Structures are given as structure tokens and as C-alpha cells.
From Swiss-Prot:
Organism this protein belongs to: Synechococcus sp. (strain CC9902)
Superkingdom classification of source: Bacteria
Disulfide bonds: none
Primary location class: membrane
Family of this protein: Belongs to the PsaE family.
One Pfam family hit: PSI_PsaE
UniProt topology in membrane: Peripheral membrane protein
Function, in words: Stabilizes the interaction between PsaC and the PSI core, assists the docking of the ferredoxin to PSI and interacts with ferredoxin-NADP oxidoreductase.
Name of this protein: Photosystem I reaction center subunit IV
Keywords per UniProt: Membrane, Photosynthesis, Photosystem I, Thylakoid
One GO CC term, this protein: photosystem I reaction center
Amino acid sequence: MAISRGAKVRIKRPESYWFNEVGTVATIDTSGIRYPVVVRFEKVNYSGMQGVDGGINTNNFAESELESA
């Protein structure tokens, strides 16, 4: 599967907060790291403080954990 920057992808890592959610590929690292694909999402995860806008809206994934949306 050829994933490129800007592509819409669905997350297939079951333990991920964003499992089965669709995000946009922000960057792809070609240096050989374990999780080279950075995916950006519209919503943030649960790590933000209560009552404050915040949280994380990006995460790294392996290509095998993604499918085209």
C-alpha cells in the first residue's frame, strides 16, 4: 500500500484511541523507525486537562496499521 502525505487513512491498531477513525497523513519518516507515519486527527484524545481545550491530535503508526479511507 502506498501511503503519501495528505492521504486520508483509517486506523487499524486496536489499542489506539483512534481505532477505526479517519485521519490525514501529516508526514512519513523514511529513516527506518518503527512507526514512521504521523497521522493528524480532527478531534483530540483524552489527555487534555478538564475544562481546557487541549489534548493530542497526532500519533505515529506503522504502515501495516493503516488502510486507505
